[in-house]
Amino acid sequence: GYFTASLLTQYCTACFRPFPSEGARRAFLCYLLSSLLELYHSFVEHFTEFWREDAKPIYQRSGGFCEHLARGFLPDVLGFAAVPCFPQITTSLTPEFAQLDGKARGQAHELCLVLSRYLLLERERWDTMEDAVQAIGAVTQIYLDCLE
């Protein structure tokens, strides 16, 4: 949860910190979203692998139980990504936010709050992590468009 939250706060601050170019910013934002995807898929893959190796035989024989559990991870992962962001928004000790000046920090805080709230309240809505990541990008774009 905290690692996914860290990726989310990095994403929010990257929207407002200086980059050599907008292309560099977009590439970094894509990298962070790709990292969220990779982290989630790696977790599910390792869980499934450990299930096959270590689950009690009675559970292994019950067809589809592992897959059922794995499908339930997505809302949990999204919730555990969102919740740690709330206290990080309210403190100046968070390194990601501390590197920004006043206005940029406020905007990054606000974006992080918007995304965290959205992920927490809508986490049951998505069937795949790809859907959730696409929603993060869409909400971010709406937020940034409102600033213009």
Q: What is the role of each PLM region?
A:
Residues G1-A55, A81-Q99:
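Active-site activation/catalytic loop segments of kinase-like enzymes and analogous catalytic loops
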Residues S42, I58-F65:
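Long, amphipathic alpha-helical stalk/connector segments used for oligomerization, subunit docking
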Residues W51-Q60, L74:
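Fe(II)/2-oxoglutarate
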Residues G63-E148:
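ATP/Mg2+ or Mg2+-diphosphate-binding catalytic cores
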